[in-house]
From Swiss-Prot:
Source organism per UniProt: Oryctolagus cuniculus (Rabbit)
Protein name (Swiss-Prot/TrEMBL): Large ribosomal subunit protein uL6
InterPro entries registered for this protein in UniProt: Ribosomal_uL6-like, Ribosomal_uL6-like_a/b-dom_sf, Ribosomal_uL6_a/b-dom, Ribosomal_uL6_CS2
Keywords attached to this entry: Acetylation, Cytoplasm, Ribonucleoprotein, Ribosomal protein
GO BP terms, alphabetized: cytoplasmic translation
Cytoplasm is among the record's keywords: yes
GO CC term (a single one): cytosolic large ribosomal subunit
Amino acid sequence: MKTILSNQTVDIPENVDISLKGRTVIVKGPRGTLRRDFNHINVELSLLGKKKKRLRVDKWWGNRKELATVRTICSHVQNMIKGVTLGFRYKMRSVYAHFPINVVIQENGSLVEIRNFLGEKYIRRVRMRPGVACSVSQAQKDELVLEGNDIELVSNSAALIQQATTVKNKDIRKFLDGIYVSEKGTVQQADE
């Protein structure tokens, strides 16, 4: 069965400007600008109201999979709005049984060097995605803090760090060493 029209709206806060260029959404906020291209999805995007403070996503004559893209786009736009207002922060903790993992931040937080992982001499270097800054936490031992506006870039950078510390040729149930995401949140606290 085909649904004639499925639509959802996203409310845009006062301190955020949103603009459409075809199916490319550009969100401007206090922390910066994010843009995202939805050209590969066949939907209609439109701004409603006099002040253009509501984004509507329409999908005509879609099957079940195509209708799911409506909510997906809304979620992506909400994440962009959250990113340019509050920013995203991921915290990662080093876990080790014997050899302490030594993490050094290079190039103003854009390069992470991991040394002494499982006592290895090899230095693992992980470059952060553009727009993501990494720092060593002052409050907590063995903690990395990743901050940025784009949730996909921040989470992807965290994944790259976690994948760099995979244990090879050992039983991973026993060898739990690595750097893992311990907390996901925002840079600024939401006023709620």
